[in-house]
Swiss-Prot record:
Keywords, comma-separated and alphabetical: Cell adhesion, Cell membrane, Disulfide bond, Glycoprotein, Immunoglobulin domain, Membrane, Repeat, Secreted, Signal, Transmembrane, Transmembrane helix
Domain annotation Ig-like C2-type: ranges: 54-116, 138-209
Domain of life (superkingdom): Eukaryota
Signal peptide positions on this chain: 1-22
Extracellular side: 23-231
Function of the protein: Adhesion molecule that binds to leukocyte adhesion LFA-1 protein LFA-1 (integrin alpha-L/beta-2). ICAM4 is also a ligand for alpha-4/beta-1 and alpha-V integrins. Isoform 2 may modulate binding of membrane-associated ICAM4.
A Pfam family hit: ICAM_N
Cytoplasmic side: 253-262
Record's protein name: Intercellular adhesion molecule 4
Gene: Icam4
Transmembrane segments: 232-252
Example GO BP: cell-cell adhesion
Parts forming coiled coils: none
Family annotation (InterPro entries): ICAM_N (IPR013768), ICAM_VCAM (IPR047012), ICAM_VCAM_N (IPR003987), Ig-like_dom_sf (IPR036179), Ig-like_fold (IPR013783)
């Protein structure tokens, strides 16, 4: 009962993908193709695939053409094996290194050509995010956060939080390297009484066009012991006096990493 009721509205959505009220269009103008010939469609699955840098992926291009078709995959990625069945072809894509690669599958059925697209993204979640205990030098604390083995570094944002609130963040978009990287963030701050016993944490976030990957460090504390009487006398809000990002990039590690993967 229910599925019989649902079917017409689903068909309508497919026939009128955009705009207007499908109900009204149904009343005014029923779909042109006869009920027996479904509209020709092409799908490429999955639409978004994530792989480690240098990894490979399989994409399945399927269609509903009852006739023998010509189908091809258009991409800048290197193609590997192909497996096919009736109504589908599965393509292997090799050595995905770009953080974002577009793939199109083009199928021609009885003179009509349609295509479907998919995206493959290569990324590597940081192996570790480590915030060192603050080091007191004079009246200032030096915080160091290490983010190791991350890719693509150009889409990384590293932030420091105190008591859950962001006190500093830096985007590394100026770095366009195509290798795994280590990032060290150094932050120097003054601390006052308010900062005592507040957990400090370091956060790494990759934002890959909708795919967000987050990692964070274990918390560290500013303790009474580290706080000198002189710094209590200083402003109770922290002031950044020097900030730096250090980036180490290792092509060697991409290879090592891949060796571990396979
Ligand atoms: C490809 O997709 C078709 C249709 O969804 C499915 O029947 C087939 O098993 C899939 N092939 C592979 C290799 O996943
Ligand atoms: C798979 O592809 C081959 C070569 O193009 C073709 O001869 C064969 O009919 C295809 N198999 C199926 C089940 O479509
Ligand atoms: C990155 O950090 C890891 C772990 O701390 C270290 O073993 C490796 O040598 C570093 N790689 C580079 C390129 O600095």
């Amino acid at each position: 009962m229910e599925s019989a009721l649902l079917l017409p509205s689903l068909l309508l959505v497919a026939a009128y993908p955009r705009g207007g009220s499908p109900q009204q269009e149904w009343m005014q103008s029923p779909p042109a193709p006869s009920v027996t010939s479904a509209p020709f469609w092409v799908r490429l699955n999955p639409e978004l695939e994530a792989v480690p840098p240098g990894g490979s992926a399989w994409l399945n291009c399927s269609h509903n053409c009852p006739l023998p078709v010509h189908s091809s995959l258009r991409t800048q990625l290197r193609q590997g094996k192909i497996v096919n069945g009736s109504g589908w072809v599965s393509y292997q894509l090799l050595d995905v290194r770009a953080w974002n690669s577009k793939v199109r599958c083009v199928v021609t059925c009885a003179g009509e050509t349609r295509e479907a697209t998919a995206r493959i993204t290569a990324y590597k979640r940081p192996r570790s995010v480590i915030l060192e205990p603050p080091v007191l030098v004079g009246h200032k604390y030096t915080l160091r956060c290490y983010v190791t083995h991350v890719f693509p570094v150009g889409f990384l944002v590293v932030s420091l939080r105190r008591g859950g609130r962001v006190i500093y963040h830096e985007s590394l978009e100026r770095f366009t390297g195509s290798d795994l990287a280590n990032v060290t963030l150094t932050y120097v701050m003054r601390a006052g009484l308010n900062d005592l016993w507040q957990p400090l944490t370091c956060h790494a976030r990759l934002n890959l066009d909708g795919l967000v990957v987050r990692s964070s460090s274990a918390p560290v504390m500013l303790t009474v012991l580290a706080l000198s009487p002189a710094s209590i006398a200083l402003a109770s809000t922290s002031i950044a006096t020097l900030v730096g990002i250090l980036l180490a990039v290792g092509a060697v590690y991409v290879r090592k990493y891949l060796a571990v993967q396979t």
